[in-house]
Amino acid sequence: TNSTEYIPGIAMSIHAHPDDQEFSVGGTLARWAQAGCEIISVIITSGDSGSNDPAKDGSHKQELAQLREKEQLAANTVLGIRQTVFLRYPDGELEPTIALRKDLTRIIRQFKPDAVLTGNPEAWFYGDEYFNHPDHRAAAQAACEAVFPSAGTRLIFTDLLA
């Protein structure tokens, strides 16, 4: 690695769905992991709506969630990520609620990352070809608000104080 390249000691990746981090920051995470960074992957939703297979109906959601977690753990192994947190919120229904921000604040306070990677909460479109999923925007907004002000302000969520 370049001696001037920033490599955090601990980094946290916070994304809505299994597979989101691979499309957005996977290369950075792999590079950082290879350089010795400890990475915590936080996946907010279960990914249980991530199929348009006409043979699947609501009865398959638990099976799909288990498959998505297995796939995410395998992807994280390839990237060099050894710690994964699944919050298991419903896929396709994510909102940047106080409850979600509190869950993320708890995890940030627990691991104390030097860097947090997430999506852009304001990005509705990427170029001319991709309409950003509302779960991505909600996850990014909640992650940003958990980083600041919540994680660093002791009197926000005092029940999380050690």
Language-model-detected regions and their locations in the chain:
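Metal-dependent de-N-acetylase/amidase catalytic core
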Residues: T1-I14, T97-A162
